[in-house]
Regions:
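Aromatic- and Gly/Pro-enriched, solvent-exposed loop/edge beta-strand patches characteristic
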Residues: 95-170
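Beta-sheet-rich sandwich/jelly-roll-like modules and their strand-loop junctions
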Residues: 30-102, 148-201
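Sec-dependent signal peptide recognition
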Residues: 12-19
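N-terminal secretory signal peptides that target proteins for export/translocation
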Residues: 1-11
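C-terminal motif of bacterial Sec signal peptides marking the signal peptidase cleavage site
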Residues: 24-28
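Short, flexible, glycine/charge-rich loop motifs used to bind or transfer phosphoryl groups or to couple energy/partner
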Residues: 19, 77, 130
Length: 201
């Protein structure tokens, strides 16, 4: 009787240990299977220009029409990875062949050129484009070549202070260069902004 009780206790002990090992194994499997894969954050599409104008203080506007040809625009970097999906433009005059360029700031090379038909004055035109991926914190520039533009300044004059954050975009400078050539502008000015060319990000 004693031997059979010992055998029974040994069997029970074996069963308990086996049960515990199986439970631990299943628990570990569940923990692996239950690891949640976090989907990438999707930000709503934004055109950062309006926020740039407000945050820069360049809220006084005058129209320049047929005022000489320039390549001009803004230097920016995204605060997150993302894509440009559209180019926007608005001018005080019609321009069927407005050239808008996205540049790699560091190499001063062209990443994308789009011709926008500004078919009506003082009207925001949006042109969908093949997506252009932008890398977080990398510097880019968007420029247009035009002899018409809105000249935006502070109401009491003065300069703005860069960088200027507008949503997920950080603007770091305004650049310009005279002429019709598609050439990277090298003159900087913090006392005004001329435009409008922008993008949807």
């Amino acid at each position: 009787m004693k031997n059979s009780a010992t055998i029974l206790n040994t069997k029970n002990l074996f069963r308990i240990m086996l049960f515990l090992l199986l439970s631990l194994s299943i628990s570990n499997c569940r923990s692996d299977d239950d690891d949640v894969i976090t989907p990438p954050i999707v930000y709503p599409a934004e055109n950062p220009l309006a926020a740039y104008i407000t945050n820069s203080g360049f809220t006084a506007t005058s129209n320049f029409i047929n005022s000489g040809d320039y390549e001009f625009g803004l230097v920016f970097s995204p605060n997150v990875n993302g894509k440009i999906t559209a180019i926007t433009a608005q001018l005080p005059d019609i321009n069927a062949t407005l050239r808008v360029t996205i540049w790699d700031f560091d190499t001063q090379t062209v990443l994308k050129t789009e011709v926008v038909n500004v078919s009506a004055a003082n009207t925001l035109i949006t042109k969908s484009v093949a997506e252009l991926a932008l890398v977080k914190d990398k510097k880019y520039a968007i420029t247009m070549n035009s002899n018409d533009w809105y000249n935006r300044t502070k109401p009491a004059a003065g300069v703005t202070t860069y960088p200027i954050t507008a949503g997920n975009i950080k603007f770091t400078d305004y650049l310009w260069k005279s002429g019709t050539a598609q050439a990277f502008p090298t003159n900087s000015d913090a006392s005004y902004y001329a435009g409008d060319a922008s993008f949807v990000f």
